Design a protein with these regions (language model features):
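Acidic catalytic loop of the alpha/beta-hydrolase fold
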Residues: 88, 175-179
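Short beta-to-alpha linker loops that shape the active-site pocket of alpha/beta-hydrolase fold enzymes
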Residues: 2-6, 85, 204-206
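Catalytic nucleophile-loop/oxyanion-hole region of alpha/beta-hydrolase
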Residues: 1-38, 224-228
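Primarily recognizes the serine-hydrolase "nucleophile elbow" in alpha/beta-hydrolase
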Residues: 20-104
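Short beta-strand/loop motif that positions the catalytic acidic residue
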Residues: 164, 169-172, 176
Length: 246
């Protein structure tokens, strides 16, 4: 399995990788005893952005000219998104990761400082603490440095939902202070405007990066959340409902 990561993961490279994966699965559907009509895509956080991007751009000839003779090869049957990045301007700009004082930038333990971005733009110093502008840090890796307004618009996915976008199941923790829940609200609203089936769950509790929200995926005690842990069953029921409609 080879795909774009780290400094090589500049858009649209990850999106091209996702399309290749979808096409590969569908091309081998008979061999693998799969029904190519029912291949869903799922992603969480930045992966949620990638899954949603494939779902909104799958039939975009400018984005995917190599599939223009058969866009169905890369069309997801639906998407399952967990705390997804959707709007590139709806991410924490003043994230507290516990940095006291104003240490030198090279002494800060934060692994997402892109070499093409000035650390002074990522680290916000005030009240004897150093905060992280995660919006700048995240977008720098997506675009290889400082993005243009055009790039921000192009990859803020609520702007590109169409009548051919596949159905979506979306969940988000209501206390997410990194990728704000309004990302999910904005995408769900855009889907509804185009009459695309969408199920949205914003749980009252729960922060970012919960995974299954149980002991299987926890790294910290707060990542175990009974409310959010219901999402796999809810998603499975949603998939069944989508399949019944087809």
């Amino acid at each position: 399995l080879r795909y774009s990561v780290d400094l090589a993961a500049v858009m649209p490279a990850p999106l091209k990788d996702a399309a290749k994966a979808m096409a590969y699965i569908k091309d081998h559907a008979d061999e693998w005893y799969l029904d190519s009509r029912y291949v869903f895509v799922s992603g969480f956080s930045a992966g949620g952005h990638l899954a949603a991007a494939l779902s909104v751009f799958w039939d975009n000839e400018e984005m995917f000219p190599e599939y223009k003779d058969n866009f169905d090869r890369i069309r997801p049957a639906g998407m399952i998104l967990g705390y997804p990045v959707i709007d590139l301007k709806s991410t924490a700009r003043r994230l507290d990761i516990g940095i006291e004082g104003y240490p030198d930038y090279d002494k800060i333990n934060f692994g997402q400082v892109h070499p093409n971005v000035d650390p002074a733009d990522i680290f916000v110093r005030e009240n004897n603490k150093t905060y992280v502008n995660f919006e700048i840090a995240m977008n720098a890796y997506m675009f290889g440095g400082y993005p243009t307004d055009e790039q921000i618009y192009q990859y803020s996915l609520q702007n590109h939902v169409t009548d051919t976008t596949p159905p979506a199941f979306i969940w988000h923790g209501g206390e997410d202070g990194l990728i704000y829940p309004r990302n999910s609200f904005m995408f769900a609203e855009a889907l509804r405007e185009h009459n695309i089936p969408c199920e949205l769950h914003v749980f009252g509790k729960g922060g970012h990066g919960l995974g299954l929200a149980n002991e299987v995926t926890e790294n910290n005690p707060w990542e175990v959340n009974e409310q959010c842990a219901r999402w796999p069953k809810l998603a499975a029921d949603w998939i069944k409902s989508i399949l019944r409609q087809q």
